[in-house]
Amino acid sequence: MAMTLEQTRQAIIDRMQSFTGIAQDRIQYPNAPGFTVPKEGLWCRLTIVRGPSFTSGVADKPCNRRTGNIMVQCFDRLHTGEKALTVLSDDLLAHFEHFSFEDLECLNGESIYAGKDADFIQYNVSIRYLVN
């Protein structure tokens, strides 16, 4: 039986919750109430972005594969350097790249400098995935 979108979402959240590279109370999860941005240090925001689907086979019945991106936005205060963000990005990539669970397959990822504003510098860690 094909993995549903909800099962995929939960598998990704479970994987993020097993990540030990940053305290869990510093990660903002989708639809989780009550997150407060820390006054100091690193913090992250997890977003699961679904992509297009495609038919990968039509044996007895069509097999549709779903695509998407696991996006982890990583933030640190300005003027604290970028080493901590770089190490966190490396750790997140190592944690997610080529991970699989049931019909979820995480592919390669990247860490991209996303800029800064008046308070934070931001890196985006993005890992592509396929389901089914």
What are these regions (language model features)?
Residues 1-60, 80-91, 99, 117:
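Small/polar-rich, solvent-exposed N-terminal microdomains that initiate assembly or binding
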Residues 48-51, 61-68, 72, 103, ...:
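Alpha-helical context
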Residues 75-82, 101-106:
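Short C-terminal domain-edge/linker segments immediately following a structured domain
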Residues 62-78, 121-132:
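Oligomerization/assembly interface segments of phage tail-like spikes and tubes
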Residues 18, 90-132:
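Acidic-leaning, charged glycine-interspersed low-complexity segments
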Residues 50-53, 66-70, 92-97, 128-129:
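Short, surface-exposed linear patches
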